[in-house]
Amino acid sequence: MTSPRRIRLFLDSNVLTGGIVSPWGLDKATLSLCAAKVCRMVLAEVVRDEVEDNLLLHAERLPSLDADQLIEDYRRLIRLTNAELVPYPDKNLVRSSRHLIRHAADVPVLLSAMASRPDWLLTHNTKHFTKTVAQRTKLRIATPAEFFRTLSTLLG
């Protein structure tokens, strides 16, 4: 008997960072679904690098033991999820795709999501990852709250 296909979640850096640094919440619940292998985390290298930079900045403001624990929690999460890695998009493609999204820094993230074709792209950045962007790219873009509301209707 084959196991059911897992929902593939492409996580933007704000969801991933929020889930790591927050003691609870939907970001952390999203990471828990991935760690439990209920969902499959799709992790773009561009997102991973941004998260690691953000975590190091966050860790600098913490007591030494807490900072060490934060970094260890992140490493453990990456091991547990066995994330599907998405390489950086080609620089020429990034330049030529600038029209797809309002903020230039989001182009590599968007292209990585398009290349990986996840079931969902989860982000809190609804100012840039708009419904128009979703229509242009054929991506299902939502906040973690929207994802969980949809999930609850499927299970209920």
Where are each of the predicted segments found?
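Short, well-structured N-terminal submotif of metal-dependent ribonuclease cores
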Residues: 1-43
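Short secondary-structure boundary segments
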Residues: 13, 45, 124-126
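Conserved nucleotide-binding/hydrolysis micro-motifs of P-loop NTPases
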Residues: 16, 48-49, 127-128
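Short, flexible helix/strand-to-coil boundary loops that buttress conserved ligand/catalytic motifs
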Residues: 20-21, 55, 133
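PIN-domain endoribonuclease scaffold, especially VapC-family toxins
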Residues: 35-94
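Short, surface-exposed amphipathic charged segments that create phosphate/polyanion-binding patches used
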Residues: 56, 100, 154-156
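Active-site neighborhoods of divalent-metal-dependent phosphate/nucleic-acid chemistry enzymes
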Residues: 79-120
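Acidic, PIN/NYN-like endoribonuclease modules and their adjacent C-terminal/linker elements
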Residues: 107, 111-114, 119-120, 126-156
